Amino acid sequence: MKYFVVLVVLALILAIAVGPSDAVFIDILDKMENAIHKAAQAGIGIAKPIENMILPKLTK
């Protein structure tokens, strides 16, 4: 979650500093944030089945 906050702050600083005409930087940051988010989702998707195989079911 920290990376998202950092990217939001950077996006706001750049939006204020460069103005709306140079919003390319904002688009790049948005694409980076989306890529990081998708990578995290993929990592969780891979780790969850492995975790379920390794850890015994404690509720049964």
From Swiss-Prot:
Regarding tissue, the record states: Ejaculatory duct of adult males.
Q: Name one GO biological process term.
A: innate immune response
Keywords annotated in UniProt: Antibiotic, Antimicrobial, Immunity, Innate immunity, Secreted, Signal
The organism's place on the tree of life at top rank: Eukaryota
Q: What is its main location?
A: secreted
Q: State how changing residue 58 to S affects the protein, per the record.
A: In strain: New Caledonia
**Which factors induce or repress this protein, as stated in its UniProt record?**
In response to mating.
Matches recorded under Pfam families: Cecropin
Q: Which InterPro entries match?
A: Cecropin
* Secretion signal, residue range per the UniProt entry: 1-23
Q: Does the keyword Lyase apply?
A: no
List GO terms (cellular component aspect): extracellular region
Function of the molecule: Male-specific peptide with moderate activity against Gram-positive bacteria.
Give the family per the record.
Belongs to the andropin family.
Q: What is this protein called?
A: Andropin
The organism encoding this protein is Drosophila simulans (Fruit fly)
